[in-house]
């Protein structure tokens, strides 16, 4: 498999034009409330919260595209975009520290 140059990754990553009617850049979704047909669908979305929108503060297709792009560029497994610097610091510390640290 041919290695993709960094410049190409920067241009292509996080974009799925054929999922968006051929439009290159993903649309900007601004949402706080997400509706579901029933509670079963809501529960399903909550268990898959990092891949599906269930509450606007936890991600929209726009933030998912950003997270995918950053992970791809950094050769990481996954990225989580947060709403503030304090929340990103907290997530980082809570991921690596135990209660007696």
Feature map (PLM): residue ranges:
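Structural motif
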Residues: 9, 27-28, 78-80, 101
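Short conserved active-site loop signatures built around small residues
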Residues: 1-29
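A short glycine-rich, His/Asp/Glu-containing loop-to-beta-strand
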Residues: 27-32, 44
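Conserved PLP-anchoring active-site segment centered on the Schiff-base-forming lysine
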Residues: 95-101
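Short, acidic Gly/Pro/Ser/Thr-rich loop/turn segments
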Residues: 18, 35-39
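Pocket-edge structural micro-motifs
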Residues: 15, 30-34, 57-59
């Amino acid at each position: 498999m041919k290695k993709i140059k960094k410049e190409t990754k920067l241009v292509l990553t996080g974009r799925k034009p054929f999922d968006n009617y051929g439009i290159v850049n993903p649309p900007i979704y601004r949402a706080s409330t997400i509706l579901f047909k029933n509670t079963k669908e809501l529960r399903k979305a909550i268990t898959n919260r990092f891949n599906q929108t269930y509450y606007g503060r936890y991600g929209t297709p726009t933030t998912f595209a950003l997270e995918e792009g950053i992970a791809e560029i950094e050769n990481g497994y996954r990225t989580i975009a947060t709403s503030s610097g304090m929340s990103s610091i907290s997530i980082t510390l809570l991921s690596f520290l135990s209660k007696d640290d």
